[in-house]
Amino acid sequence: MNKLKKEYLFFKQQEPNMRTLLVTNMLYALVLPIVEIFVGAYIMRNTSDPVMVAFYQLAMYIGIITTSLVNGYLLKKYSVKTLYSVGILVSGISMFGMMTIKSLGFIELGLAGFLMGAASGFFWTNRYLLALYNTNDNSRNYFFGLESFFFSITSIGVPLIIGAFISQIDGKEVFGFLFNINTS
C-alpha cells in the first residue's frame, strides 16, 4: 500500500495539464472496451453477419487514416484541445446514429464506421500532440508508461467484468424485466 501512496504522490507532483490529460485518457480507456464490445455485438445482433462487422472495421480504419491526414490542416485553424474534444464527441454521436438506423446495410455501416474512425483519428492524433505539449523529457516516459499500463489493464479487465456481469445476470429478473441473453 505504501508503494501506491508513493505513486499517487509522484502523480500529484506532475504538471496540472499533464495530470488532467492522464485522467481524461484513463477515463477514455475505461469506456473504449465497452464501446468496442457494444458496437461489435450490436452489428452481429442486427445483421448476424461477421462480414458486416469486418466491413465496419475496415470503414473505421479508413476513417482513422483520413482524419489523421486531415488533422494537420485543421490544426492551422482550430486548437488541438478542440479537435481532441471533437474526437471524443463524434464517437458518441456515431454510436447514437448507428443505433437509430432501422436497418444496417453496407452504406449505413460504412458511414458509421468511418465516423467512428474519424473520432478515433481526431482523438489519437491530438492526444499525442497534447502529450507532447504537456510533458517534458523527464516526465514523458512516466506519462506514456502509466497510460499504457492503464490501457492494458482496462483492455483486459473491462471485457472480463462485462462478461462476468452478463453471465451472472442471465436468467434473472430485475425491475420486472427478465434478462435472457439468448433472445433479442
Please describe what each predicted stretch is:
Residues 144-163:
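Glycine-rich segments within core transmembrane alpha-helices of 12-TM secondary carriers
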Residues 89-104:
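C-terminal ends and interior cores of transmembrane alpha-helices
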Residues 3-64:
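Helix-loop boundary and gating motifs at the non-cytosolic
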Residues 122-135:
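Intracellular juxtamembrane helix-capping segments at the cytosolic ends
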Residues 67-80, 166:
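Helix-to-loop junctions at the C-terminal end of transmembrane segments
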Residues 26, 105-123:
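Hydrophobic core of transmembrane alpha-helices in multi-pass small-molecule transporters
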Residues 41, 73, 157-179:
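Transmembrane alpha-helix termini and helix-breaking/packing motifs in multi-pass membrane transporters
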